[in-house]
Amino acid sequence: HYMIILGGEPFFVDYMYKIYEKYNDVYFTPFTNGTLFNDEVADKLCKLGNVMPMFSLEGFEEETDSRRGKGIFKKVMEGMDLLRNRGIPFGVSSATSTHNIDKVSSEEFIDMLIKKGSLMSWYFIYMPVGDKPNVKDMLTPSQRIDLGRRTRKIRTTKPYFTIDFFNDAPYVGGCIAGKYYC
């Protein structure tokens, strides 16, 4: 079994560790901002052995800190080091927009992630929602197609796996939210 944990910050609540421990036949992938990682958290994950965190990054320091707050990039890098040093698998999640598409899918960024120990990246397409959605941040059709090309190139030329939520949708039958819940 495999479960993805989304919404909020899963490392903020201690009861998640009890769930991971109780269901040790399930592999969990919690998506995290990475700000709560320290030796204690890394040791717990090492002991559990069934949790693969996905750190949210919007690119390098400039892109990540401008979207997520000053100092977040460095904190995520520290968290990655803690996990890598313990042999704990982890990956990265990026919300792609016109501001960061060239960074998060660049060879330089992927090479940095590989050196840090990341095994994979998820690319999610920015969708404008809320009271004041900014459609200018949405990827253009050509940028979406280019992301698919870059994703396939990374998969075939690097020891790294990428999932492009837009272009890979046909392989998984599309988005279940759009098919069953909306």
Question: What are these language model-derived features?
Answer:
Residues 1-6, 13-125:
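Radical SAM/AdoMet-radical enzyme domain recognition
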